[in-house]
């Protein structure tokens, strides 16, 4: 009996069926009540007691292998049938989905192009920075709030290393390595320890500009800002500079533009003022120049910085900052015409 079971086991392992009808015939042959395996089960009672353990082992293996083989062949037929049913040769092909630039990439490119026409080149730097390039070289006091863990992401076990909070660190690296004249813009991602909401995020994107040369004045800065505003928004755009404070510039200012929604007449977007803030700027503090090895008695310069998300919000009236990082195709497709 053991030889017969082993022979059947070999036969089952090599079992094949061309279609569902042949498979059903094989199932009846082996697994039906009158099938060969059932017959062996009935004969098992006549096996000698000292052989039952070994014979029973092979008999169970035969039954399990047969059932598994039948199921495997059945599944293969079902998959083929499903695939054949799904094929419709008359159906129009799916359109190829073409990717487009992200709205932030569109605006960043536009900003870089505008300053490129003013002679600025692009400079980039690391997102993981040290305290010197992010804070100390830029005239931040030791007790400045920006150095707190509540505002900045520090690297664990190394308090001197952090995720940059602005791209000004790129400016200091360039000033350390390059002699004036320097005319650069620094686009990139920055990080702040802030709660995520419709108006704030733990990471966002900035573009900062730096111009250092002999006899650079605030008038040069103002003219560059006016050119940028008119090119970025519209030729009718007006600018307004308000005194402000930044550790790395003196004097410092914040720039507003006439609201591009209402044309400066006043609306809910500009809170009825007719003006919208877009960036900070100022003349580079002499201490910053000296920290980077540039003689502040010979050279002067201006710097400015803006959030790309902020400019994109103004240009396309996007009200929720989180939309830029959620990868919602319905939102992104609205910018296809701008590519």
From Swiss-Prot:
Catalytic activity as recorded in UniProt: tRNA(Phe) + L-phenylalanine + ATP = L-phenylalanyl-tRNA(Phe) + AMP + diphosphate + H(+)
EC annotation from Swiss-Prot or TrEMBL: 6.1.1.20
Binding of Mg(2+), residues: 250
GO CC annotation: cytoplasm
UniProt keyword list: Aminoacyl-tRNA synthetase, ATP-binding, Cytoplasm, Ligase, Magnesium, Metal-binding, Nucleotide-binding, Protein biosynthesis
Annotated localization: Cytoplasm
Co-factor note (free text): Binds 2 magnesium ions per tetramer.
Listed GO MF terms: ATP binding; magnesium ion binding; phenylalanine-tRNA ligase activity; tRNA binding
Stored Pfam families: Phe_tRNA-synt_N, tRNA-synt_2d
Cofactor(s) it depends on: Mg(2+)
Any one GO biological process: phenylalanyl-tRNA aminoacylation
Subcellular location, principal: cytoplasm
PROSITE patterns per record: AA_TRNA_LIGASE_II (PS50862)
InterPro entries on file: aa-tRNA-synth_II, aa-tRNA-synth_II/BPL/LPL, Phe-tRNA-synth_IIc_asu, Phe-tRNA_ligase_II_N, Phe_tRNA_ligase_alpha1_bac, Phenylalanyl-tRNA_Synthase, tRNA-bd_arm
UniProt family annotation: Belongs to the class-II aminoacyl-tRNA synthetase family. Phe-tRNA synthetase alpha subunit type 1 subfamily.
Assembly, per entry: Tetramer of two alpha and two beta subunits.
Protein name according to UniProt: Phenylalanine--tRNA ligase alpha subunit
């Amino acid at each position: 009996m053991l030889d017969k079971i082993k022979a059947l086991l070999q036969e089952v392992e090599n079992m094949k069926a061309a279609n569902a009808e042949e498979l059903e015939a094989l199932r009846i042959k082996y697994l039906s009540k009158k099938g060969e395996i059932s017959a062996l089960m009935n004969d098992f009672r006549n096996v000698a007691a000292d052989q039952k353990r070994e014979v029973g082992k092979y008999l169970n293996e035969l039954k399990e292998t047969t059932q598994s083989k039948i199921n495997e062949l059945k599944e293969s037929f079902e998959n083929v049938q499903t695939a054949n049913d799904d094929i419709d040769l008359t159906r129009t092909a799916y359109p190829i989905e073409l990717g487009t630039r992200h709205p932030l990439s569109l605006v960043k490119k536009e900003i870089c192009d505008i300053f490129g026409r003013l002679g600025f080149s692009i400079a980039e730097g690391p997102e993981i920075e040290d305290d010197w390039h992010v804070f100390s070289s830029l005239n931040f006091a030791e007790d400045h709030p920006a150095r707190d863990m509540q505002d900045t992401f520090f690297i664990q076990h190394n308090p001197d290393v952090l995720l940059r909070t602005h791209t000004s660190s790129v400016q200091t690296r360039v000033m350390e390595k390059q002699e004036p004249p320097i005319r650069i813009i620094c686009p990139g991602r920055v990080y702040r320890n802030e709660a995520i909401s419709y108006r704030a995020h733990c990471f966002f994107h900035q573009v900062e500009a730096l111009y250092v040369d002999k006899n650079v004045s605030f008038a040069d800065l103002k003219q560059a800002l006016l050119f940028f505003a008119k090119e970025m928004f519209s030729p009718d755009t007006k600018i307004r500079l308000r005194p402000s404070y930044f550790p790395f510039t003196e004097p410092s200012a914040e720039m507003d533009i006439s609201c591009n929604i209402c044309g400066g007449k006043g609306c809910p977007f500009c809170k009825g003022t007719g003006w919208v803030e877009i960036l900070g700027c100022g003349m580079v503090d002499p201490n910053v120049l000296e920290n980077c090895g540039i003689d502040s008695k010979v050279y002067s310069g201006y710097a400015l910085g803006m959030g790309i998300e902020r400019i994109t919000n103004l240009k396309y009236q996007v009200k929720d900052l989180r939309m830029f990082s959620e990868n919602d195709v319905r939102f992104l497709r609205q910018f296809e015409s701008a590519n």
